[in-house]
């Protein structure tokens, strides 16, 4: 019996390996519809009442989707953001339905939010209740940072959006989108392309570039990534607020204060976008509780830290599964635990610094900015190398550079049709 099970498992694994190695280019319809399909599964499986049935249906749907995608298709750079959102939707669904019950765990904290508790609804129709549950589910799955919900990120910045009228909000965000594109083009044309090798139609091994060039290119790409993410976020805000599906106060700035960039911990915890923070925090809490770690202990603090970055690594590795890179695919995962290790070293240095009587001040923070710049441009070289290896900087389906550096021309490079829509799900 045991031999049969092992033989059957081995043959199945070999069949999957063969299918994985003989995958075809992802069809156009799939590149445009996969992320909405994943989101639709998440929204629709929230509609049935709590119980094992919807968990089984959801697990079956997500498992089937992933098995089909991973064994049949490969994609290109334009699918980068879709891969991240597909795995993020899956992980968030598992946390909601397997590790909890969304109807109990989540509720809105504003009067404008939809509630699924009906007061005096003896005569309420099933259709009305179903539509209310659908609206609530859409609002829940459209909110990843918790604005207006009981899981709001306490580090969210608050700005002019709190007092702006709808018209002022739309105009200011449209202007910022145009400004971001202008700045990004300037950075690409006069800085990034100046450091990029002038090799037409040639593969560039990012790790072979001079050290200073690599650090400079990574820093510039970080700037361009932040501008791209900010623009997509603002486009989503214009859509939702313009259609009266949301209000300006639910769209605080995507990024935190640049003055906090004196530690790597602050980079990831306060400055960079916090779209997936709740996923990482929830996973860390589950592991910490499983270890019976008490709040305030080192075990509690660092189990949550490392689990959060490991989950982020898995999230980023989804890109390498769908967009193969023999040289840099592994880096999409290991970059995240590397940041956790740097944060640990930071904590040790801060502890012994305090013991030695070193006080926080301008000079210490100046050193912190240098520290953060060094480690970020060193480790972020892994995903930049990945993008380079899959043709992201040479015009082959480029998803971030609007123009290839081989010519610095004005030719527009096609991107995934749902790159913008991906970012709409999760920025409220």
Swiss-Prot record:
A GO molecular function held by the record: O-acyltransferase activity
TM annotation in the entry: 33-53, 55-75, 78-98, 305-325, 329-349, 366-386
KO phenotype (gene knockout): Fully eliminates the production of asperlin.
GO cellular component, as recorded: membrane
UniProt membrane topology term: Multi-pass membrane protein
Source superkingdom: Eukaryota
Biological pathway: Polyketide biosynthesis
UniProt-annotated location(s): Membrane
GO biological process: one example: lipid metabolic process
Residues that carry a glycan: 8
EC numbers: 2.3.1.-
Keywords for the protein's UniProt record, in alphabetical order: Acyltransferase, Glycoprotein, Membrane, Transferase, Transmembrane, Transmembrane helix
Induction: Expression is controlled by the asperlin biosynthesis cluster-specific transcription factor alnR.
Group of enzyme by EC: transferase
Family in the record: Belongs to the wax synthase family.
Functional description taken from the UniProt entry: Acetyltransferase; part of the gene cluster that mediates the biosynthesis of asperlin, a polyketide showing anti-inflammatory, antitumor and antibiotic activities. The first step of the asperlin biosynthesis is the production of the intermediate 2,4,6-octatrienoic acid by the highly redusing polyketide synthase alnA with cleavage of the PKS product by the esterase alnB. 2,4,6-octatrienoic acid is further converted to asperlin via several steps involving the remaining enzymes from the cluster.
Name of the protein this chain belongs to: Acetyltransferase sirH
Organism expressing this protein natively: Emericella nidulans (strain FGSC A4 / ATCC 38163 / CBS 112.46 / NRRL 194 / M139)
